[in-house]
Amino acid sequence: MNANVTVDDAISNVNLLDTLAIPDDLPDIEARALPLLYRSNFDTNFEDRSAFVTGIAKYSEEATRHAQFNDMLSEGLQHAANMYTWRCCSRAVPMAKSNDQPNRTEINEMVVEVLKPEVSKLGSFMRFTLTAIQRFCEEVRRLCHSEKRRDFVSEAYLLTLGRFINMFAVLDELKNMKASIKNDFSTFRRASQFLTAMSDTQAVHDMQNLSMFLATQNKIKDDLKLQMKTIEGYEELLCDVVNICAHMYEHQLYLSPNEKHMFVKVIAFSLFLMDGDAANVAKLDQKKRLSISRLDKIFKTLEVVPLYGDMQIQPFAFVRRSSHYEPSKWPLSDKESDRCHVNIVEKVQSIRSDHESYVTQFAKINNEVAICDRPGNDSENREITSLALSGIQLLCQWSCAVVETISWKLLNPTNPKDNRECPENAEEYERATRYNYSPAEKTALIQIIAMIKGLQSMLGKTESDMSNSTRKCVYVELQAFIHHTINEPLQKAVKHKKDLLASILQSVKDSISDAGNELNRMTDVKGKKKSSAPKGDSANSSSSDIRIPRRTAAPGSTQLYMARTQLESLISDKLCGGKKILRKELDSKTIEKISVFLRKSAHWPALFRLSDSMTEAGELSQLWFREFYLEMTMGQRIQFPIEMSMPWILTDYILSCNEPSLIESALYQLDLYNDAAQYSLFNFNKQFLYDEVEAEVNLCFDQFVYKLSEMVFTHYKQLASCMLLDKRFKAEILRSGTMIRSPSAARFESLLQQRHVQLLGRSVDLNRVVSQRVNMALLKALDAAIWKFESEPLSSIVELDMLIDTNRLCHTLLSDVLHSIAPFDDLFQEANHAVNSPHGRITLHVFWELNYDFVPNFVYNGSTHRFVRARHVFRKTPAREKPPQVGQVYYWGSKSLMAAFMNICNAYSQCIGTQHLKAITRLLHYQGIAVILDELLKMTNRLLNDKIRRHVRNVFNMMPKVCKLPRSDYGSNALLQYYVHHLEAVGKYPELKSEFCQDLRELGNMIVFCQQLEVALGQEEAHDLFLAAAYTGTVPQPPARNAQEQMKQLAKLEDKYSRIHLTEIIDKISPDDGQAAIAKDAELMTKERLCCGLNAFENFLVRIKQMLAADDIWTGGYPTNGVFWIDECVEWYRVYSALQFFLCQPTRDDNEVYAEELFGDSLQWGGLTLITLLGQHRRFEVLDFCYHLHRVNKADGKDEVISGIRLAKMVERIRRFQLLNNQIFIILENQLNENNDDPNERVREFAPPVHPNYANHAARRQ
């Protein structure tokens, strides 16, 4: 190890770890992804048959024919795929409108050029069918020869003949169905005849034959049946085919839905072929070669099967077409059922039970193998092999249930009479898919598909291990069977000179023995050494000494075929070469062992290609293909919309049914598109079909992400709203009979954790794309909340604050499952338009409301510390802009939650108080508050210098120059009369109780708003400091008996909380000094927020005081006595005293409204704040008109009506005004003197007072 590694090199090496692909520990709720890897295929199609020189020649020849038939079957499947995927070209090519059209020749030449390759395929198809029918009939004729009728025919060969019969049925039905093929051929023929391109007689003849071939319905079936009738005894061979297919179907010896359905189609079509000039089926039933009742049950259990793609067929329809069909012999199948033979809703229960049992067993075995760090033994390998086979069989059974249900539904569309949801104008395909399934059926299909895909995925992850275990198990069983089971009858056959039996057994042994020569030699040597032993023990002793190696070597396809075929011939009831039935020459135990081996080995080829077998067993591409229904639209539809597509119908149902148990199955439904794409490319070999699948996937996945994002956002929005909803409130409304339900538990977590969703070869980060959508939804929700606030008065800021808190909590909940979601503050800043603008929308609207509604139209109530809207409005509020229409989910999540929160918010809608101001401080922060206060100062300046100044000047002009305080000797009644007389002109000022009071009210609203805002800001800051105390090292002093004990406890607490003291932690672990300095500055600013004397209200008052000092109208200039004005009416407090005199007068009419009802306490706050800031507080208390009247009346207690004013009522009102004034003065004095740290009193020296007479005398002498 190199010790000279620098820090940079070490960091770069650590960074390289990010490039390592680490498997994600994600929930497995996605189907098996087909890897882009090569696959080994050991199926040689009997190319190596010549290597088995020791085998019976008959079976080698059969293998040769078998290979030829397999090649023809492959070619037939290619023709079937070509015909099924045929799209009409003649509708797309231009057509000549008349014979006189000048470019008609060019058009026809283009038509011929385009259609010629396709027509050549049709010619190949016709020639293939003729060749295949001829070759099939030749083989049937050979097998039905009188000398070969009783000869043994292998099971595999009979199944191959059955596949050929199935191919003929499929090709003929496809030819009948595809009208577009005939249209294209007719177009090509007309165009070619116009061009006289076919002068060759043979070409014309071939064209006529092809035309007749395409035009004749059931041409292939009829030709086949016609030729089969000429073969003597063909019914017996077809009877064998029917019996083997029935046997395979009844004993479930199939591993894919296609095999199962093929067996039934072969049975039906074979019965059709067997029905010739006589009732052959009935005769065979009488001979007990066939059992009609047995076949009747089969047809009843499977009424509809897929023929090809989305083409469906009733197998029993072939039987009905027979000329000698007798309904009485088919009591079950003759009656068509109006219900699907598969009750998918009930079937899902048993499927779920099987799924749980299998998964439990699989997990048990898999865990046992995983924890043992050693190769598996024979028992474990046998168990895993059985498990793999059971898995494929379960996949096949479940897929059959889905496919058969879909097939029955496609063949039996619903109609508007039976289904109210189905509209009258619904298309045929729409009635077969979109409206043809009940919610219970959709749920069952979704669950079964999810179990199919889930089991495929589970098996796919252990495919390599299971394949190795399977090959080891097969190898051991095969070698054990050869050396234990075959050895004894082989030695007996040799001993008793049964040459044919011995040659077959030896051939089987040579075919599949791994170490034949050596083992045979060992057997011979041991047999000679123990010749004296009992006869019955020689074989056992030799076989028991054999040590079979454990190798991962599976037999080849030809090798296994040869062994199985020869073993079948041994236990068959038919002749096997030499006209002998060899079964009689074997004992029952050997026959039983061979039968068990044949049953086991029947599935070995599927296990050898485990991956392909799993794919075929769970292949559900049929749910997407719709070529048959597209053909039926006759060109009106190029493709059906996604609303008619089964994969999207099931996916959309998951997203709309509000069933949490289904949400984890959504990706399994999307995997149906993977099946369709795979089948399009590798089975149909059609790029355009893949392109259509891809186009639908693009659209459906966008819709899936959109709807899933909506579901996720709605769920967590409702959850957040319920969490914030007061519990007592919920309890109260529950008592009243209304219940607000919390959202049911959803299973989004597993789905949203998927980071590598495989779809058409793409890897999609579902978490990221949903996060993007949810980001947009959160942004829209915040935008809607701000829009709602902008369309309502300032009182709705509490609702805005609650909405933002709800969205913040929703974001917090979402961030636990969506890791790519943007920070909430970024989303809020973007919605608030505070990214590129110095002021956000909330700040601007708060100021707008303050300027146009709050300041002119609200009044302050000092008792409740709230602002309420005035009875009479002097300023009309401009119309607010209406918010855009958005769903309720963007506000509170649901209708019930919105009603609940609106009920809560209505309590704050009629006033503006502490909750509103706290909301303003939380939403505007320091920057926004500074902007608001700055604008309020500008409004105050305009109000003082423009409006209030004008009113003050007018009042000064109407007041007497001097208004002394009358002596108390006159009595309170005289004083009232005195003031009424002297202030009569002021009382007649038209704007005194309207505009003047309104302006003072506006000034008071701004001042009180600032004062209340400062209180709310202080409370919020104290709360922030309390929460931050533990992280800033601020530890409260613990209670203790003495100082020493308190210091000990404080030291312990400081040590305890030092672990989360951010500044100390950063000092210790951060190598950057700048970062530590920033942390210290941040902590200092946090701690000193309330300690540095910052006070917005005080600064606001100081700024107003500076505005007042700029104009002498408020102070009357320099007093003539050099001290202050006394009786002169030149100062602001004199104006306010005159105003207060009229405000304190009781009403003279019942319809008259008191000033406090119109202006509240805001008017007094405005006037008294000016008095305080001008330093006229004491003079006002001493020289105020109303106060003087109150003092005198308090002494004499008089009560008279003077000038319509009752003295006692006025004095009572003066007392109340005085109480409120004193409160206001105390608040203002405390605020202004709070930070006055000047210890020296402001003392001013004056000359001694001079008597007025002396002053006048001195003036005359001068």
Swiss-Prot record:
Give UniProt keywords alphabetically: Cytoplasm, Developmental protein
Q: Which domain of life is it from?
A: Eukaryota
Query: InterPro entries, per this entry?
Result: CYRIA/CYRIB_Rac1-bd, Cytoplasmic_FMR1-int
Name the segments for region: Disordered.
519-550
List the GO biological process terms.
axon guidance; cell migration; cell morphogenesis; cell projection assembly; embryonic body morphogenesis; positive regulation of clathrin-dependent endocytosis; positive regulation of egg-laying behavior; regulation of actin filament polymerization
Q: Can you cite an annotated GO cellular component?
A: SCAR complex
Consequences of knocking out this gene:
Embryonic lethal with cells differentiating, but failing to become organized. The external hypodermal cells fail to spread over and enclose the embryo, but instead cluster on the dorsal side. In one study, animals are viable and there is defective extension of body wall muscle connections or arms towards the ventral nerve cord. In this same study, double knockout with madd-3 results in severe muscle arm extension defects.
- In which compartments does the protein localize? Cytoplasm
Q: Which GO terms describe its molecular function?
A: RNA 7-methylguanosine cap binding; small GTPase binding
Q: Show the PANTHER family listed in the entry.
A: CYTOPLASMIC FMR1-INTERACTING PROTEIN-RELATED (PTHR12195)
User: How does the record describe its quaternary structure?
Assistant: Interacts with gex-3.
Q: What is this protein's function?
A: Required for initial steps of body morphogenesis. May play a role in egg laying and yolk protein clatherin-mediated endocytosis by oocytes during oogenesis. Plays a role in the formation of muscle connections, also called muscle arm extensions, between the body wall and the motor axons in the dorsal and ventral cord.
Membership in a protein family: Belongs to the CYFIP family.
**What is the protein name given in its UniProt record?**
Cytoplasmic FMR1-interacting protein homolog
Source organism of this protein record: Caenorhabditis elegans
Task: Give the gene name.
Answer: gex-2
